[in-house]
Amino acid sequence: SAASDVYKRQVQDQVWNRVTINRNSKKNTRYYIDEFHLLLKEEQTAAYSVEIWKRFRKWGGIPTGITQNVEDCLKSLTARTMLANSEYLVMLNQAPTDRIELAKLLHISDNQLSYITNVGFGKGLLKCGNSIVPFVDNFPKNTRLYQLMSTKPGEIQEILG
C-alpha cells in the first residue's frame, strides 16, 4: 500500500540519520533488514537500498539483508547487483531454480552446489570475498544460546511455556 511504502522510506531515512550520527561519534551501525525482498518491490525503496549497500561501509554502516527465499531477489536486477557485490553471504538450502541463478551470479561450482541442495538445518555455503566454502553447524540444542537464537515457532512456544 502507499502508506506502507511511505513508512518503509521513513525507516530508511531514520537509519541513514543514525549512521550519520554514529559516524560522527566514530561508531559502526549494524542494520539488519528481515524480509529484505519487500524493499525491492517498490522502486524508491529499492533504489534507496542500493545506495545503502554502496555507501554504508564508507560511513561505518554494516547492512544485512535477510530473506527466506532468494527467488524474489534474483528477479530484480538491482538485487542481483547487490548480491554480486556483497562481501559476505550465507546460503542455506535453495530451490532448484534459485541454485542455478546463484551459481551463475556467484560462480558456484557443481560440487559446491551440493551443499545447498536438499540439505538439512545448519548446512550451507559461505561466500566471503572471493572464497566460497561449505559449512556444517550442528549447534547443540540443549543450550541457552540455542534457545535464544531459534526461530522455529514450535521451539519458541516451548521455550516461552
Where are these regions (language model features)?
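Conserved P-loop NTPase motor cores
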Residues: 4-116, 141
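Conserved P-loop NTPase motor module
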Residues: 1-5, 10-21, 25, 118-161
